[in-house]
Regions:
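The feature encodes the CheY-like receiver
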Residues: 15, 57, 75, 87
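Acidic catalytic/metal-coordinating carboxylates
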Residues: 13, 33-37, 60-66
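Short amphipathic alpha-helix used as the core "switch/output" element in two-component signaling
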Residues: 40, 62-75
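Charged docking surfaces used in two-component/phosphorelay signaling
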Residues: 16-24
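Short hydrophobic/Thr-rich beta-strand motif most characteristic of the beta2 strand and flanking loop
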Residues: 26-33, 41
Length: 121
């Protein structure tokens, strides 16, 4: 059975690139362009991993992650934040979320899928 990945990013170019890379690596991929849709899809599809942008139009990715942590169905799903902001405050924000790590932008297309797999349980 293929692993499921959910990508939440409002930038269509990033979304399609990440989707293509994960599909080539064998993932079944679901996508959302805002946090609310991403939360709903996570609850419905129960992905093995979530790849989420930190800056979404309706809320920060870290806020969406905290909502997912409150739900027994989604609390243990690892989250990979993809962010251009690797400043200390952003890193601290991510460290405060269990099961969360980050990959800096721009992503490395050669290693992205491998990095995502490494963060899965």
């Amino acid at each position: 059975m293929r692993k499921k990945a959910l990508i939440v990013d409002d930038n269509k170019n990033n979304l399609m690139l990440e989707k293509d890379l994960l599909e080539v690596a064998g993932f079944e991929v679901f996508t959302a362009e805002d946090a609310a849709s991403g939360i709903a899809l996570a609850r419905k599809e129960k992905p093995d991993i979530i790849i989420m942008d930190m800056r979404l139009p309706d809320m920060r990715g870290s806020e969406a992650a905290k909502i997912l942590l409150l739900d027994n169905e989604t609390r243990n799903i690892p989250i990979v934040f993809v962010t251009a902001s690797v400043l200390a405050e952003g890193i601290e924000e991510i460290k405060a979320i269990p099961n969360a790590v980050f990959i800096g932008k721009p992503i490395n297309t050669r290693t992205f899928a491998k990095e995502v797999k490494r963060f899965m349980k």
